[in-house]
């Protein structure tokens, strides 16, 4: 097969994910198609998939049908206005994470209005999603992110570079250690 019509690829993916019991079939198929075709939205999808795109879609649908989290299949996750990398072994952002980030951003904004500046510390930062959202959305806020484990810390470093959150101070340390908390 040299090219695969988009509507056929979409139907095939829907059937496979539905048969696997995936609940969010339409959203997952849309994300997998965008990922396989390197498209920024469904409106940028080609009318036909190349052989390479088709193979990538087949592989991704196969992994997702095995219940591998969509974000680990595609290697990306969306958080507020950010597109972050995702890897197995590091927590995936959830809707509740966005609510928490929103609260931190609002509180940092209130402190900035009162004092002129704020400091936010994100302990056990994982991918860095909360820290980067706060740094990019809350002006005059100093952000520190602490992560003990090597893989999440490496991911947070990559994500910081990816989203341009250079104001975030990343620290590889134990969040429960007194020296970390007092920054000595």
Predicted regions and their residues:
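Non-catalytic accessory regions of SAM-dependent methyltransferases
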Residues: 1-49
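Short, solvent-exposed loop/helix junctions and linker helices
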Residues: 3, 7, 26, 50-54, ...
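Charged catalytic carboxylate motif
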Residues: 8-12, 28, 56, 96-99, ...
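Amphipathic alpha-helical regulatory segments at dimerization interfaces
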Residues: 15-19, 63, 159-162
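Short coil/turn residues that cap or connect secondary-structure elements
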Residues: 17-24, 65, 112, 179
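Non-catalytic, surface-exposed connector residues within folded enzymatic/regulatory domains
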Residues: 23-27, 51, 73, 94, ...
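Conserved AdoMet
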Residues: 31-107
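Conserved SAM/SAH cofactor-binding pocket of Class I
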Residues: 99-184
């Amino acid at each position: 097969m040299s090219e695969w019509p988009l509507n056929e690829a979409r139907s095939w993916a829907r059937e496979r994910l539905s048969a696997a019991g995936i609940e969010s079939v339409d959203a997952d198929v849309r994300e997998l198609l965008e990922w396989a075709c390197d498209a920024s939205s469904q409106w940028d999808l080609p009318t036909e998939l190349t052989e390479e795109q088709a193979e990538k879609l087949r592989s991704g649908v196969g992994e997702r049908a095995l219940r591998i989290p969509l974000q680990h299949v595609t290697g990306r996750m969306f958080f507020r206005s950010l597109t972050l990398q995702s890897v197995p072994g590091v927590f995936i952002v959830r809707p509740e994470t966005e609510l928490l980030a929103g609260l931190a951003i609002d509180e940092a904004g209130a402190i900035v209005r009162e004092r002129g500046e704020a400091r936010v510390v994100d302990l056990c930062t994982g991918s860095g999603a909360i820290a980067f959202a706060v740094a990019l959305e809350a002006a005059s806020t100093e952000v520190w992110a602490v992560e003990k484990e090597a893989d999440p810390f490496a991911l947070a470093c990559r994500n910081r570079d990816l989203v341009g959150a250079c104001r975030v101070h990343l620290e590889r340390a134990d969040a429960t250690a007194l020296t970390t908390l007092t920054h000595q």
